[in-house]
Structures are given as C-alpha cells and as structure tokens.
Amino acid sequence: MGTVFSRLFQSVLLVCPIKRVSIRLGSYGRCATQRYFQVLGNIHDIELNESLNSPQAIQALSFGQLSVILLWLAAYTFHIGWSGNFEAFIDNPLGVQPINHFVLDPHYSQYKVDTTIAALANHPIYHWLMTVGFTSNAQIYRFTLGLEITAAVMLVLSLAPSVGLLSMGGLEVVSWISICWAGHLVNFAPGAANLTNVVMEGPGSLGNLMNVLTFNGGIQLDTQALAVSDVAHHHVAIGIVGLWISALLRVSKYAWNFNTQSSYHLDLSLSLTVGGILTSLLAQQAYVYPALSYLPYDYLATTSLYVHHQYIGAFLATGGFVHGGIFLVRDYTLSNDLVGKLLATKATVISTLSWITLFLGFHATGLYMHNDAMAAFGVPQKQIIIEPVFAEFIQQVFFLGTPVYGLGSAAVSSTPTLSFLPIISGGDFLVHHAIALGLHTTVLVLIKGALDSQGSYLFPDKQSFGYGFACDGPGRGGTCDISTWDSFYLAFFWVNNTVAWFTYYFHWKVLSLWQSSTAVSDEDSLYLMGWFRDYLWQNCAALLSGYDSLGSNDLAVWAWAFLLAHLAWATGFMFLISWRGYWQELIDTVIYMHLKAQARFIGLAADVVTPVALSIVQARFIGLAHYVAGFILTYHAFVVGATS
C-alpha cells in the first residue's frame, strides 16, 4: 500500500511544471518533462511500476480495489440510515422524496440546506433497498457492517496461492451468490409471499416451482417494476450460466487464450469489453424493464441511472480496446493463431469500417443540414423525412411474440411512467444513424490503433517504440500522433461525444413522453436547430435562473455547478490547443522573475528549482481530463435542472 501511495504522490508531483531536485529521479533523468513522459508511457506496465514480480501480487491489486469499493458503499449506506429518510420513504414511496444526507457546509443557509437535500437525491439506492427487502434503518446498519466485513475478506483473499484458482473460483463464487440472491428475493423481498404460497400449494409439483422462475409476472401496475419472480429467474439463469462457463474453463485450461502466452492485458481487454457491453445493456434494461420498485415514478433517478451506466459502459469498452493494443505491443509474438489471422486481415477490417463511417457521416449529417436549410428558408415541407420501416417491423415482431415470451400485456403497453415500445418517427431514424456514426468512428479509431500497434505500412517497426511515443524525428515524416496511445486519446473524445448523443436522445425522448409532447419533439428533432433550441437551450432555462440579484431558488447550487463545470470543460480546450510553446515561455518568465527577486518559491530555495515545460503528452492528458470531467459534470447539472 505504501508503494501505491508513493507512486500516486510522485505522479501528482510530475504533473507540475516545477520540480525539486531532491525528488528521486530513478533512470528517467533530470528533466521533469522527460520523466513524466516516461512514466505516462509505461504506466500500464504494472509489473515495473509497482515492483510486482508475481501473479499473486498483481491479483492482490484487484482485491484491494474491491475492498475500497465496498468500503465506499458501506459509507454510503451508513449515511442513508443515519441522516436519510428511508423509513418514511418505504411507508409512502410516491409521496416522500428520498434524500441523500444532511448538508453540513456552514456557507449554506437553512433554506438552501432544505432545498439542496431533496435536490441531491438523484439515485435509485432507496428503491433498491426497498425492493430487496429492507424495512428499517437497523437493517441498513447491519448491511453496512456486512459490507465492511466483506471488504476485509477481500484483503485476505489477496493471499490466495494461485491466480487460476482465484479466477475460476471467483467466477464460481459469483455464480453461487447469484443463485443464493434469487432465494433471498423469493423469501424476503416485498411481494414474495405469494410466490412462497405458489410453491407451498404443491411442493411436489415441478410445475409450481417453475412458475416462480418464469417471466409470468411482467410489469406490476402498482410499482411499475418487474415482479420479484422475474428478477429471481434472472439471477438463477446468471448463476447457472456462470457455473457452466467455469466448468468449461477448468476443462479447457484457458485454451480460449488464443494459444498465446498468459497476458494480463489480454484478460483485462476481454473483461472490460464484455463488461462495457453488459453495462450499456443494463442502462437500456433499467428503463424498459425496471427491476426496482417505484423507480419509474422518479424521473430524475431513472434518467440518472441511464446516463450513469451508458458513460461507464462506453469507458469500459474503450479500455478494452486500449488494453488489447497494449497486449499486442508488449505481450504478443506474431504467429499463426486467431490473433495473427486477425492482424493479417487488418487492412480489410480498417478499410471496411472507414467506408461505413464515411457513408454514415455524409448521409446522416447531410440530411440534418438539408433539413436545417429548408426550415431556415421557410419551406419546411421540403425536409427529407425517412420512415423507420425496419424499426416498426421489429416492434410488430415484439407484439406478435408476446404469447411466446409470456411477458403479459402490461409489459408491452405504455404507462404514465414508461413506454416499452414508444412510437418512433423520422427524427428517431436520423438520430439513430447519427449515433451509429459516432459508434463506428470510435470503433474505427480504436481498432486501427490496436491492429497497427505492432506496425503499419507507414511505420513497420512501430512495436519497438512501445505503447506511446511522440515522433520519430523529421526524417520519417508522418510518424507523429500515430502511437497506440494517440489512438486512445482521439477515440476518447469520440466516445465522450457519442455517449452525449445517445444520452441527449434518451433524455429528450423520455421528457417528451412524460410531458405528453411527443409531437413537438418528433418534428423538431428532424433538424439540428431543433435539438439546440428545444432540448438544450429550453431545458437550460431553469438552471440559468437559479440565482440572480433578486435571490436564489432550489436549483441555485446546481446552477453554480453548471457554471463551474463549463469552466473546467473550457479549460480543457486551452491545454489541448496551446501545447508546449506557450507554457514553456510562461514558466520560464515566471521562474526568471522569482530568481531575479531572490524570492522563495513554494518554500523551495531558488537554486533547486528548474524551469520545465509541459510536453505535448502532458498537455493532451491534462486537457482531456478537464474536457471529459467538465463535460460530464455539466450534463449532470443539466439533467437535474431539466428533469426535476
């Protein structure tokens, strides 16, 4: 743990353009810019960075992370029991607004404390606690204690003797926990009593037992959520599939590893990619088939849950491609296996994806620009509106298949709070293809970066330069910005913007459904000005009037956060556009004046301060962090202001 904190402290110091000679330099040299570039370029070499020379030590890092996550969850649930209103919420889930915790900031007035407490509750934790059977704060405290004990167990598990045992045994443990959780839901969750009665009516009948574990419940009209039997069936299925996969892994001896040497980056790449896909699917399922009781009545929590999981899913999937590229650079030797065959056909893969993105880009943006021009020229009847025929056909298949799936009529009908199969329009057709453009472009950048990580027609010996490098000198023109790290850097902007597109679309769609104004959104989503005017600008109104010279309202804190996040987002562009040169001159000038005045700078003697500049990689990294964090926090405040 000390090594981890030491590395974290050094990384923080390395970001600063001022360094102290007394810092341990290692083999990276005296120049802070060079040292930071080397650390950043090798940050994924966990064996070197953390001085780890055994698989068990590397595996211990994962369990340490799980322990920290469990402790964070324990603190969260403790505060709900200590200063929340959970017991009042379960007595009247439709009339009581759940709160997070008290605000102890002395700068808040009592009025602002009261309004901010309610406004902060944009999460479904209360709904989950009620759905799984919690009925009192005392039970929440016991659950918190259980989380803390489990966190301690995670640290003990890091001492296991075999990584293979941890990997396969961990999958088995998760599978059995999933099956046991299904049993907990059937016996203790609200509404489970009728399920127990079904089994007890005919304990010797297999049919009665299967009735508990099928999709016969559907959406309940009172809670607007799936029946407990559906959720229990889901967890039983997950457990059985997990046990089956674990058995396959034991038999195959990790033969799925493409006959390559063991690679942590390959394992992590596959895990991140699958995890990203499942997380994105969960975002869709949480709205269409909500598993938490009364969640659809809470519009803000529903929207936040969707946006939260879409961002996590996109970032996990991006990380999967990144670690796949690191695997090819560091751990893979070209051979006639599955990976080698993929690399042999990379030109076909990259060119095909390129043509797809060009087709989507020209057609989707071209349609939007045409429709904007027609609306601006006063002839909106000349807009191109394409009927989503294929999507309508898919919806009809769902309706026809209702008896087969056994979902029940409530599952496929619109309600005041959710719509399983909403009516789609030409605007939906356009935005779906715009989202497809963003997704395919992101995948193109990531796949190209990974498949070209060992070498390309322009740069055949790229692998010898490592995962990240700046340029290979003027003698090899075009070798700048083509490392695998650079592809991740570019793709992260694309994936951030793509997630914004489909969260914008989801949010506007559900807002129009909740407000019964679908006709307006269907018409105005056909052109870009409609998106800006009727979604972004119109829904900013509540935040923009959060506080003024006459006072403030209950959204004032979020209006302030909206402004602050905008500033962080804009700061990102400053670093992205103005790289090494500007900061070099600025820092040199500042250091010169301090040395000339014989001043002490940040408590250090003048003779131990060396002026250095931000490298291109430094500025890109800092700019990307500001851009993404500012963008997400800006949208967070926007969702609260527009939905609440």
From Swiss-Prot:
Question: What does the entry's cofactor note say about binding and number?
Answer: P700 is a chlorophyll a/chlorophyll a' dimer, A0 is one or more chlorophyll a, A1 is one or both phylloquinones and FX is a shared 4Fe-4S iron-sulfur center.
Q: Which SUPFAM superfamilies match?
A: Photosystem I subunits PsaA/PsaB (SSF81558)
Entry binding sites for chlorophyll a B3: 574, 582
Q: Which GO terms describe its molecular function?
A: 4 iron, 4 sulfur cluster binding; chlorophyll binding; metal ion binding; oxidoreductase activity
Instruction: State its location(s).
Output: Plastid, Chloroplast thylakoid membrane
Q: What is its EC number?
A: 1.97.1.12
Q: For binding [4Fe-4S] cluster, which residues are annotated in this chain's numbering?
A: 471, 480
**Annotated PROSITE patterns:** PHOTOSYSTEM_I_PSAAB
Specify the superkingdom: Eukaryota
Family of the protein in this entry: Belongs to the PsaA/PsaB family.
Q: What is this protein called?
A: Photosystem I P700 chlorophyll a apoprotein A2
